Amino acid sequence: MPNPVRFVYRVDLRSPEEIFEHGFSTLGDVRNFFEHILSTNFGRSYFISTSETPTAAIRFFGSWLREYVPEHPRRAYLYEIRADQHFYNARATGENLLDLMRQRQVVFDSGDREMAQMGIRALRTSFAYQREWFTDGPIAAANVRSAWLVDAVPVEPGHAHHPAGRVVETTRINEPEMHNPHYQELQTQANDQPWLPTPGIATPVHLSIPQAASVADVSEGTSASLSFACPDWSPPSSNGENPLDKCIAEKIDNYNLQSLPQYASSVKELEDTPVYLRGIKTQKTFMLQADPQNNNVFLVEVNPKQKSSFPQTIFFWDVYQRICLKDLTGAQISLSLTAFTTQYAGQLKVHLSVSAVNAVNQKWKMTPQDIAITQFRVSSELLGQTENGLFWNTKSGGSQHDLYVCPLKNPPSDLEELQIIVDECTTHAQFVTMRAASTFFVDVQLGWYWRGYYYTPQLSGWSYQMKTPDGQIFYDLKTSKIFFVQDNQNVFFLHNKLNKQTGYSWDWVEWLKHDMNEDKDENFKWYFSRDDLTIPSVEGLNFRHIRCYADNQQLKVIISGSRWGGWYSTYDKVESNVEDKILVKDGFDRF
């Protein structure tokens, strides 16, 4: 469950005078979560959407783009709102409803269960950028702390990719902050539990599911980036009844829910661009290169005005702030630039590792360093509030140079900061445009904990005494599969062997080679459950029950006897000498 937030944000066209006086009222009385996330009940919902960060709120607003028209400027307001117990996390609510659905505690009409699962998959992937917290009811004026004016400004074609090369618009936040005189400062926070259709649910409840989704934006908010990616709707979307007109998002795109796109068009609409970095003192220019088989990333010095003999390696910056290597081999996994600690305090070395949406050492910030927006500092989120950047060692020999992250204050004398240069000869402006994510893997760090010791699963199906390392076991939010990545990048998927036809109540699990995109075999699909979960009083540890889509079997491990450490699945809920509370990474569900 994501940490409950104290403040949330919403962009709204209504003025501060109106909101400060009356707050946000609901538009209807429909309390249907699936209709809410799929936007099929405009004007009828009892829920009100907010975002966890100003950036997420602005990105959602900014996705409603159109051609810039000076005669008709667009204005709105960004509101900061104090959250309370009526605010619920949308993704956690979706995950909990998936749990209840698999446990048969939510009932549906024929076909609705599959529709609901597809809606939750969209919430996990295409709409995850919204970082939504929604209210079950109106927001009082006393909860609204302040507001900022948000308006649209033109972006010249040279700094924004657009099929027609038009001048288009993006958004900005304007000072000053406007404070609400009716605001009440209280120590409240959002609800730490998921929303339920009926509080204290004890018997199965019925939820109706829409058969269509009205989606204003499936770009993951990429269109509101600094130089945004305007979705190219030419040719028109094959499954849209009313496709968007180029960049003018004044209409709604209506999708049949069965063909709701899992990727934004911006995944493939941007041109590929290599990444060039320049030393701020020596002015040497380097091309960013990669050796994916060895998880290595390095720099080669080039003359940007001459054609390089080195092959171009393509990276892109996605909505999870990852700098991802574009895969050209059809691999099952994706790789991203990852900052790792070294023996030197505060100095990190950059390698490639499997892309994970919850890996803080894969999150990078681009900060423009000049008015023309042609030079960007690249900083790692791993160092928190410490200002940092990318560096290379000026004393390193050879033609390939390692890439480091270091604090800007008092760096070692042999290190020089590198910054991304954006111009026609080097990095294209499209690189600093966030692209929609291509993968949605979560580093789960799967294992178990017993009497002060950590144990990790082995590909043999048994266990080994150690804490599962980062970057080894993942959960795919798109396919619901758990997979193990070896150092040589071989991928094995957790498979449930238990078959109801055998009549047995349990069987071992196994790790198999498998196609990530195969979608029919539910023995490869798993979900994380809180049902009947008793949390041990161990500080900082995160536990879940893990169940298989196929007949809801539960994943367990034997903790005594000759079969110690064996992983298996079972129909039995209560058993002795086993551990059913599976350890997952702290932060597994926070991203």
Swiss-Prot record:
Phenotype upon changing H36A: Loss of ADP-ribosylating activity. No change in binding to HeLa cells
GO BP term, example: symbiont-mediated perturbation of host vacuole organization
Top-level class of the enzyme under EC nomenclature: transferase
Post-translational changes noted in the entry: 8 hours after treatment of HeLa cells with purified protein, a substantial amount is processed to 2 nearly equal-sized fragments. The disulfide bond between Cys-230 and Cys-247 is required to for the toxin to exert its mART and vacuolating activities within target cells, and for protein processing. Acidic pH in the endosome and retrograde transport are required for toxin cleavage, which is required for both toxin activities.
Documented effect of changing L38P: In strain: S1 / subtype 2
Keywords noted in UniProt: Cell membrane, Cell projection, Cytoplasm, Disulfide bond, Glycosyltransferase, Host cytoplasm, Host endoplasmic reticulum, Lipid-binding, Membrane, NAD, Nucleotidyltransferase, Toxin, Transferase, Virulence
Regulation: In vitro ADP-ribosylation is enhanced by dithiotheritol.
Signal peptide: none
Residue ranges, annotated region (D2 domain): 273-439
Protein induction: In strain S1 (grown in vitro in SP-4 broth), low expression, higher expression in the presence of mammalian cells. In vitro expressed at low levels in early- and mid-log phase, transcription decreases about 130-fold by stationary phase. In vitro protein levels peak between 24-48 hours then decrease by 60 hours, remaining constant until at least 144 hours (at protein level).
Phenotype when changing C247S: Still has ADPR activity in vivo, no longer vacuolates HeLa cells. Protein is prone to increased proteolysis
Effect of gene knockout: Among 102 tested antibiotic-resistant transformants, none had a deleted gene.
Region (NAD(+)-binding pocket): 206-256
Known function: The main virulence factor for this bacteria, a mono-ADP-ribosylating toxin (mART), that transfers the ADP-ribosyl group from NAD(+) to multiple target proteins in vitro. Also elicits cytopathic effects in mammalian cells, such as disorganization and disruption of respiratory epithelial integrity in tracheal epithelium and vacuolization in the cytoplasm of CHO and HeLa cells as well as in mice and baboons. Has at least 2 host receptors SFTPA1 and ANXA2. Internalized by a clathrin-mediated process; protein is rapidly taken up at 37 degrees Celsius. Clathrin-independent or caveolin-dependent endocytosis were not detected. In HeLa cells internalized CARDS trafficks toward the nucleus by retrograde transport from early to late endosomes, then the Golgi apparatus; at 16 hours most toxin is concentrated in the perinuclear region in the host endoplasmic reticulum (ER). Failure to localize to the host ER prevents ADP-ribosylation and vacuolization.
Domain remarks in the Swiss-Prot or TrEMBL record: The N-terminus (up to about residue 249) has mART activity, as well as NADase activity. The C-terminal 41 residues are required for internalization by HeLa cells and for vacuolization. The C-terminus (residues 266-591) is required for interaction with annexin A2. Has 3 structural domains, the N-terminal mART domain (mono-ADP ribosyltransferase, residues 1-205), D2 (residues 273-439) and D3 (residues 440-591). mART is joined to D2 by a linker (residues 257-272) which has a disulfide bond.
Note: Provokes a strong immune reaction in infected patients. In a mouse infection model, pulmonary disease severity correlates with the expression level of CARDS toxin; strain S1 produces the highest amount of protein among the tested strains (S1 / Subtype 2, M129-B7 / Subtype 1 and M129-B9 / Subtype 1) and the most severe infection. Other differences between the strains were not explored in this study.
The protein's assembly and partners: Monomer. Binds to host (human) pulmonary surfactant-associated protein A1 (SFTPA1), the major mammalian protein component of pulmonary surfactant. Binds to host (human) surface annexin A2 (ANXA2) on the cell surface; anti-ANXA2 antibodies decrease binding to cells. Interacts with cytosolic host (human) NLRP3, which it ADP-ribosylates in vitro.
Protein name per UniProt: ADP-ribosylating toxin CARDS
Organism: Mycoplasma pneumoniae (strain ATCC 29342 / M129 / Subtype 1) (Mycoplasmoides pneumoniae)
Lineage: Bacteria, Bacillati, Mycoplasmatota, Mycoplasmoidales, Mycoplasmoidaceae
